[in-house]
């Protein structure tokens, strides 16, 4: 599995011939200086955790350009279908979606989900974390935007993820110390990748506090620069 951080909560996952984009907020991200076309080249699937603009991001345009299938909760899929995304594969919390080379499972997250158009709020279902279980290789858990919650223990028991993607930026998600507590208390990750930090001034700007809080835990923390990648 090759995992590329594209900034904020956006990732590119390459496994067994599939190219998965998670929450591809790219052109609107002031810290992303790459090419959307290059970042999304060969995309087969777009997996979305929830309906906020900084997570849906470029998903509709990428889906139209590449034909990638959008996998998300029902409301997000229907909303994007109305925006011209034809290849959708909806699910909901607790469900799993077989995508061939991998399975996507939608887990609970403590957050909100929606957007605003013409001054009106649009409800876009419950927020999710996503577990990507490949036919071969490590299981990946992207927590989405969330606070810590005790049922993370059930996610660990059910899916046994080896790689964790963890929001740490505070303000709109849990902060570094709470995120580290979640990792320590509920999971047995081989490696974790922090996200949802440094994008805007309201967020924590560095993963340093998260890394320090996991000191001595035995969990490897991979915190690449935007565009950097890991092989698992």
Curated annotation (Swiss-Prot):
Source superkingdom: Bacteria
GO MF: hydrolase activity
Pfam families: Lactamase_B_3
Membrane-traversing stretches: none
Residue ranges of coiled coil: none
UniProt cross-references to CDD domains, sorted A to Z: metallo-hydrolase-like_MBL-fold
Keywords: Hydrolase
Family matches, as NCBIfam families: PRK00685.1
The family this protein is said to belong to: Belongs to the UPF0173 family.
Protein name: UPF0173 metal-dependent hydrolase Msil_0741
Source organism of the structure: Methylocella silvestris (strain DSM 15510 / CIP 108128 / LMG 27833 / NCIMB 13906 / BL2)
């Amino acid at each position: 599995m090759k995992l590329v951080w594209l900034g904020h909560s956006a990732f590119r996952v390459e496994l067994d011939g599939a190219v998965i984009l998670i929450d591809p907020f790219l052109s609107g991200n002031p810290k992303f200086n790459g090419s959307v076309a290059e970042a999304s080249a060969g995309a087969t699937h777009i997996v979305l955790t929830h309906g906020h603009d900084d997570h849906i991001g470029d998903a509709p345009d990428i889906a139209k350009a590449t034909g990638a299938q959008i996998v998300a909760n029902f409301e997000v899929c229907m909303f994007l279908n109305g925006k011209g995304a034809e290849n959708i594969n909806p699910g909901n919390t607790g469900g799993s979606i077989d995508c061939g080379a991998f399975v996507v499972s939608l887990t609970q997250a403590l957050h909100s989900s929606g957007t605003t158009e013409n001054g009106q709020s649009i409800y876009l279902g419950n927020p999710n974390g996503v577990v990507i279980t490949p036919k071969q290789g490590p299981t990946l858990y992207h927590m989405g935007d969330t606070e810590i919650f005790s049922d993370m223990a059930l996610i660990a028991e059910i899916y046994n993820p080896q790689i964790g993607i963890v929001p740490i930026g505070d303000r709109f998600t849990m902060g570094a110390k709470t995120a580290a507590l979640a990792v320590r208390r509920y999971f047995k990750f081989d490696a974790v990748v922090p996200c949802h930090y440094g994008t805007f001034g309201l967020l924590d700007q560095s993963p340093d506090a998260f890394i320090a809080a996991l000191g001595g835990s035995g969990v490897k923390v991979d915190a690449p620069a935007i565009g950097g990648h890991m092989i698992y």
